[in-house]
Curated annotation (Swiss-Prot):
Subcellular location field: Secreted
Protein name: Chemokine-like protein TAFA-5
Superkingdom of the organism of origin: Eukaryota
Keyword Secreted: yes
GO terms for MF: cytokine activity; G protein-coupled receptor binding; receptor ligand activity
Expression by tissue: Expressed in the subcutaneous, brown, epididymal and perirenal adipose tissue (at protein level).
Function: Acts as a chemokine-like protein by regulating cell proliferation and migration through activation of G protein-coupled receptors (GPCRs), such as S1PR2 and FPR2. Stimulates chemotactic migration of macrophages mediated by the MAPK3/ERK1 and AKT1 pathway. Blocks TNFSF11/RANKL-induced osteoclast formation from macrophages by inhibiting up-regulation of osteoclast fusogenic and differentiation genes. Stimulation of macrophage migration and inhibition of osteoclast formation is mediated through the GPCR FPR2.
Length: 132
């Protein structure tokens, strides 16, 4: 005699497909939320990497990489010593001090070859930034 097809006597057997689709819907929504949260808002920047080298006396070399989501006509730059979206004209003409890269109360001067700028604090300390 051939075996008879088995039927489930569990009451939640019909709920399993529904639960499975709910689970996958939740997973898709969660992954979309994670993807959305990792996007930057337009016109903002974040620091991705920051390396400091203090091996030389009285001198610290810092390198940072920023990720920016700039609007049309803007490009990644520096404002008040933080990454920011600035007018692309500033970068194109190398007028670095126009983007206000120094902190409040510091003076900004272009390097002679326009490869960067210096920020001079009232006490005389000088911070030099070069663009690469």
């Amino acid at each position: 005699m051939a075996p008879s097809p088995r039927t489930s006597s569990r009451q939640d057997a019909t709920a399993l497909p529904s639960m499975s689709s709910t689970f996958w819907a939740f997973m898709i929504l969660a992954s979309l939320l994670i993807a959305y949260c990792s996007q930057l808002a337009a016109g903002t920047c974040e620091i991705v990497t920051l390396d400091r080298d203090s091996s030389q006396p009285r001198r610290t070399i810092a390198r940072q990489t920023a990720r920016c989501a700039c609007r049309k006509g803007q490009i990644a730059g520096t404002t008040r010593a933080r990454p920011a979206c600035v007018d692309a004209r500033i970068i194109k003409t190398k007028q670095w001090c126009d983007m206000l890269p120094c902190l409040e109360g510091e003076g900004c001067d272009l390097l002679i070859n326009r490869s960067g700028w210096t920020c001079t604090q009232p006490g005389g300390r000088i911070k030099t930034t070069t663009v690469s």
